[in-house]
Amino acid sequence: MCIRDSIYAALLKIAEMAFNVSTIHEAGYICSMLFIIPGFPFITSGIDLAKLDLRSGLERLAYAIIIVMVATMFAWIMALLLQLKPMDFEDLDLGPVLHLILRLIMSFFGVFGFSIMFNSPASMAATAALIGAIANSLRLELVDLTGMPAPAAAFAGALTAGLLASFIKENNGYPRISLTVPSIVIMVPGLYLYRAIYNFGIMALSDAVSWFASAIMIIIALPLGLIFARILTDKTFRYCT
């Protein structure tokens, strides 16, 4: 993580000197760390707890929390050393149609990458990526176009991913979990978690609590969306054994 942030800061400084790139782009260092946030155990822990598999659920949740705390703490320390700040991103001067198309494309490749990291075959990764592109773009469009709160939009996106995965499972036999979890890992609010810890570190407690509360709500909403989709499409999942 130290190497990653140092490389980003060095490349940004070179870009500033060589190409007069604005310092507003230093906010992009946050994006370089988001893949470290353990979305898979966060989401699967919620599914395990819904099935009353408490041991697996609590173990995965504890593991995810430990990784998040270590990752965000180190990122905060490196941000202080390199004088990086998690500023807001600049608004994109794009039309709504082009913005949606780019979201679909970027979401596809983001989910595809996560799925490959989970050792999925290319065909399964592409299927999960297609689901994720639709679900994540829906989530973002709901927030931007309707003003829906981010947790509610995350629930809608996860529910959509779960329903699509269930439909595809019936036709090609891919394991449901191999499609649903990678497709919504991209929705895990790593940015919110990092900003919460950063603001705690600089004692901006009001901002820290706000970011942390938003992150918790989204983290809860994501597995809930998958759980509701599973309840609607899988009769055996509706009952405890």
Question: In which residue ranges do the predicted regions lie?
Answer:
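Short helix-capping/hinge motifs at transmembrane helix termini and TM-loop junctions
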Residues: 20, 83, 118-119, 147, ...
